[in-house]
Amino acid sequence: MPQFTKEQEKAINDRGHDILVSASAGSGKTTVLVERVLKEILAGTQVDELLVVTFTKAAAEEMKTRIKAALTKEMAKPGVDYRYLREQLNQIDTANISTIDAFCLDVIHRFYYSIELDPSFTILTDDTQATLLKERALREIEGEMLTSKDKAFRHFYDNFAGDRDADSPRDLLLDLYNFAMAKPEYKKWLAQLPQIYEIEDSVIGSKIWQKQIKPYIATKFSKLQEKIASYLTQAIMETKELAKVKESFTLFAQNLNNFVQAVKEDDDYDKQRELLRSCVFTINFRKSKKWDEDLLEFYNEIQSLKDEAKSQVFDTFTSFYAVTEKEQIKIMQESQKIVTAISTAEIKLIERFNQLKRNENLLDYSDMEQLAYQILSQDTSSSQMARDFYQNKFKEILIDEYQDINALQERIIQQIKSEKKNTLFMVGDVKQSIYGFRQAEPSLFLQKYHQFAEDENEHEERILLSDNFRSTEPVTQTVNAVFKSILSTDFGGIDYQKEGQLIFGAKYYPKSLPQASEVIVHEKKNNNEKSENEIDFSEIQMVLARIKQLEDEHVQIFDSNTGKMRDMEYSDIAILTRSRSDNLEIMQEFAKQDIPLFVTDAENYFQTFELTVMMNYLKIIDNPDQDIPLVTVLRSPLFNFDEKELAKIRIKSKNSNFYSALTSYVGTNDVLSKKCKNFLNQLAELRSFATTHRISELIWSIYERTNLLEIMTALPNGEQRRVNLEALYERATSYESAGFKGLYQFINFIDRMRRSQKDLAQPLLTKEAGNAVRLMTIHGSKGLEFPIVFYVGMQHHYQMRDLNGNYIINSDSMGITLREQNYRVDSLVKAMGNITKKQQLLEEEARILYVALTRAKQKLILVGDVPSFNKKVKEWSTELNHAGQLPLINKLSATSPLSFIGPSLRFDRHVAIKLNDITKSIDQSQKILFIDYQDEDTKFIKKDEDTDNQNENTRKSALLTQTVNKLYQFNYPFRDASETTAYQAVSEIKKAFNDPIDAELENSHLLTSTNRYLQPIDTKPNFLYQTKFTGAEIGTATHLILQYYDYTNDSADNLDQEIATLIEQKKLNPDIVSSLNKDQIDWFVHGDFAKDFWKEPTNLKREVDFSSLLSARTLFKDFSDPDAKILVHGTIDGYFVAKNGIILFDYKTDHVNKTNIDKSIELIKEKYTGQLRLYEQALNEFSEKKVIGKYLILLDAKQVVEVK
């Protein structure tokens, strides 16, 4: 941007009051924010007097980098205060330019004493560990409340623990936990949840009815009344042919008016119920074959109105009037008891979870915000001190992406805001608020958006940034065409037509560049094709074909770096999807066509093929009488049963489950029976094995018996598959280490993780993408831009399963379904909650669509499929009203992005759509709509007009057909990978040291999919040689005792006391004690090496976590970038701070060969030298004293070995 617009200037320069900047996509938001910070600094505000809050670490780092660059540029100008600017530049890295979590952590570190918090806490960064601790808390609370004969809790539990979903009570409590943790006063919020159920002897007088249901019904039907009235007054209704239609609608209108009046006047509930019931049967008419075209056309409109009216009446009746008032009161009263029990249980869960974390001195991310708010909000002198500190420290608080803030974060900001001392500068775009699953509340943005516009006082200002400097005019017009029909004050909270439209501002593009946006639609006629929740194979082929075509046409891209035109490259293209579920299939199809594809986020870990197979195998080991898991395993590469074989087995035993059929087929003397017998023998062995072994041992046994690791490694993306399977083994180990047992419980735990979308996958490659097409989710693309964007899966159905469950949680309420003996019925709170939640979900889906479409710089291509294209076009043509808006009822009935896009683009007066059939070689199933933007007064172009353009489009369609027909040969490109992540664990690095002295990896294998340098794991795990506990488990237990050993207690039974304490705290499994070698522990703690520990125990540091940036080439000789750094994370067993330096040590429980002890010790020493050197380097970086000695404590040999 060569210069700032008038509105940008205001956002940069206006001072002295609170400002909300509503910045549309591509409007230069970050540039404006950086320029404002620069102007503040130049005006004398020091950088440490500003608080700049973002919501991601990447955004915070980018902000720092940009501010540094701006300051550096300013310093080069003549006449500036160079010394002052240099001082500000040096402070950027330590300034409060950070995520809100990082700021909260600063608050806790400064004022921990005000809430009596141990300052040596550790941040819990492992989601699995946090989940396991939460699971433990949940099980403890569940067990206590069920055994305490608490009738209310039992009622809650029975209401949700149905035969089909025994985990539903737990799921509810875990879901509620996420909502509660985003609230500033979570206990108060939980305690008020039952209040909305309060009801005495009248439904009409209840809180829920008066505050929510009554206004909703009145508003909903007033719009329908107006619509009906407008039709009844039309002249055509006076014709005798429509006499019955008019009579029917007039009667319906009268009944509806009576009902609405009864609602407004708070008439008796049962009276309202009967009035609404009378509306259902009053609209009844038919059309006549004798009518002319005008009458038939009008009839179609009135028929649509009839359907809408019936639908609204029926939905309202089933939601709010399904039962009598007496029954409704009983449902509300019973529901209130259950919600009270839920609220009580949730508070207990939170408190128990917090206690478990405190016992380990751990904090998780939700703790940071909760504790920071606690510190800042209490009515105490220490809290006042904290508030005063930050209010005096910061002259301005700048919040980026303000639309993503939640209620707790907003309250934290308000605690450090002072009307007299500082101001707020908030910038964001509510149209891009897409993090509802993180409890982001766009309503907070909208509240200020409307308030600041209405007040127009000297204390508050709203600034709109609408100029788009990212996209060409066709892209901005496509975005406007879609969203001016969708976003409105009653859907999305803003009037897009008046205040939200993008203004084309990228005037730097050459005039010859603009290209039409495109919609590519595949007509899906085969019922066997994929569901509407998946991307169709033909859809992928259309994308591939269009890319090939663009490449063959030498499509030109304007390069903003050089200011010149150039040929399109693969890296100019991004493919955006709503979810990651189809990523692997897309990757495989691109590999077949040798088009490079860079995937920024993997498929959901639990949905990968290898994990699906493995989890299903575990399910049938637990219980083989499960048809779907059993058939999945049989069909997998482990056993390779094909469809014919499975059909043959089923035909032989049609009336039994598949396991019985399989067992029965073994008696048949043929090749297939042997195959069945082999499978059943292995299954029987594994089921027996499972009864006497740990889950982790069972998993590894499956890997060994089936060669699963090798089979999956041989498939495309095989190394990633292998790592995913190894990760499952690690998760099982962690699960058992946390004290959990049982295969069934483990399967349920994984299922809950899957349902909550906890992704445990190892990261994919983070190498430079190079010249490759990018594939990413829409959420992953936020903040990015690409010359050409394909948005695929327009038909993908929106997920509304939350509405079908037994509970619904909103920001201010929780609605439940009451379970009676033979039926379930929604409470009024649940019915109203469903309506609210559905609109919230659909509004967010519209905003997600906005983010997707605004990523494109020069060309936007929308791709999807429909069952019947012509039928869809006909539907779309009637949906927009005279103002060019989709009616609210249509928006609330949307099932996919295509529900929004189709009507918007089909009937926009700026858009001419030319429909061309692709030739029969692909079964005429593909349709392409080339969208060209005309002047405002251009009329809609029919198919027989503009022949030249049609011929050109036909030529393009034929070329696309030829390209599709070329896509056949499979030529999978195996590529060597030599990249690594920017993060490495020492436990991984030490595996990679072939030569620990030189720290080289010349002979090691590179596991591409994990993106970490590792040697292949081919050795059997130690537990296969153990009868009870593994060497690793015994070693871990030994480390634990040495970690907590009390060097201030010299009693003879000190060791036994320590062990007993650890068992009591549930940190140590009592069963392992007999396997410990206490003599080894006694040798060390009372030996010469530890004698100084007794003298100065405070100088002894144990289990110290560290993170350190090291040169990549220090670790990996062949790393290409000599300047690259890698973040190394590890845990040091211990070090002692002596007067002259640091003595570093590490316990090792490795077996020492007593027959050749010297050689054995030397091998162990070589094995761990590299690891200790990393620890030494890290300690030297963050400690004032230097390491003067490194030692391995070899417990098995009872020797202390120095490492040079």
Curated annotation (Swiss-Prot):
Molecular-function GO terms, alphabetical: 3'-5' DNA helicase activity; 3'-5' exonuclease activity; ATP binding; ATP hydrolysis activity; double-stranded DNA binding
Keyword DNA damage found: yes
UniProt xrefs under Pfam families: UvrD-helicase (PF00580), UvrD_C (PF13361)
Cofactor(s) listed in the protein's UniProt record: Mg(2+)
Keyword entries, A-Z: ATP-binding, DNA damage, DNA repair, DNA-binding, Exonuclease, Helicase, Hydrolase, Isomerase, Nuclease, Nucleotide-binding
Keyword rRNA processing on entry: no
Residue span, UvrD-like helicase C-terminal domain: 500-783
Catalytic activity, EC: 3.1.-.-, 5.6.2.4
Catalysis: reaction(s): Couples ATP hydrolysis with the unwinding of duplex DNA by translocating in the 3'-5' direction; ATP + H2O = ADP + phosphate + H(+)
Sequence positions that bind ATP: 23-30
Annotated ranges, domain UvrD-like helicase ATP-binding: 2-472
Family affiliation: Belongs to the helicase family. AddA subfamily.
Function: The heterodimer acts as both an ATP-dependent DNA helicase and an ATP-dependent, dual-direction single-stranded exonuclease. Recognizes the chi site generating a DNA molecule suitable for the initiation of homologous recombination. The AddA nuclease domain is required for chi fragment generation; this subunit has the helicase and 3' -> 5' nuclease activities.
Protein name, as recorded: ATP-dependent helicase/nuclease subunit A
Gene: addA
